[in-house]
């Protein structure tokens, strides 16, 4: 409720849920958003295997992040199939999907290139611009020019500053649209300390441990429209594209209807039998 109160106070009309690798919270999020008069956008920040979801070799088979948002019911059905396969077939430290699944189940989805843990930012940080470009073009060709976006973020990290101009260059050279996002893990800047405490609890560390997992800045909160336009004043179209994406995403859950699973009848028999 506090999150939606904050969104309404900032004049926001839509909000997406993109939990890492899971979709457990989607129904509760949808209900709460609807009750608050905010348009809910259902999605997931999936883990994409570096090779295939079946490859599970230590120190070789990691993952890259990718944002997937549901445009419609087809997209939702495809997304839950992939997320489920991530657990039943691709689990290796994280529930991983792969490009084979994306090729099969990409219809009805909008794709964003993700945060610093995405395949494209990783390639850029490694100094491999050509690989980043090839990857971006692969995703654009798969999802379609109107459904794939280069994601721009700026949380004040050194890596953000290194990657951001290269992402803008990549988008302009390929004609792939950009979208500005903020990796919101808490509601206000003041919540950053509480986030650090929760991470300590999660990882079994204390706030004084020098090697504890932490967000290096306090910029991972829900930012206002003005804050985002200030951050990305050099590419205002990236902020405007957030509205375009929100308009494209129109999936809604339907409650109160009995939906039985479909079972194919054995050969020579009808379903009624």
Name what the model sees in each region.
Residues 1-273:
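Phosphodiester-processing cores and adjacent nucleic acid-binding clamps
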